[in-house]
């Protein structure tokens, strides 16, 4: 399936905006890609579309729980299987979510930076078929500083 077909099927748009297509083509060709776009510029589509075009799970690392929940809801509303793991969830909820990523044919797993370093995530990650990793809202890292979250100090 080509990228424009995915865009049309899930978002209802006939064409990409601005540099979206350039970013998508770069990601789709397997290159590490930094996509810088303004708020409301459609950044999420630039990693969601190529992730949908390939098998496997897209791991999305983002520090903002509200954004995670919003993105997951938006994807689910479009019929795309997505799930989030964040603080405030019980261990059982986290295990179920991660196992769903192994066995449940999910396309997107949204996770906070702190969760990357947990034993349960590291263990479950070994069984996941991750095809793509995205860091969303990466500007927050420099805004918060080096000592905001310990995971970034490794």
Identify the meaning behind each predicted range.
Residues 1-38:
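Conserved pre-motif I regulatory segment
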Residues 24, 48, 95-98, 122:
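Short hydrophobic/charged patches on amphipathic alpha-helices used for structural packing
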Residues 29-35, 56-57, 105-107:
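Pre-Walker A (Motif I) flank of P-loop NTPase domains
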Residues 30-49, 61:
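Walker A/P-loop
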Residues 35, 60, 109-111, 133-134:
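Hydrophobic positions in the central parallel beta-sheet of the AAA+
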Residues 51-53, 75-77, 100-104, 123-128:
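Conserved catalytic network of the ASCE P-loop NTPase/AAA+ motor domain
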Residues 59, 65-111:
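Conserved nucleic-acid-binding Ia/Ib motif block in the N-terminal RecA-like helicase ATPase lobe
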Residues 121-153:
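SF2 helicase catalytic motif II
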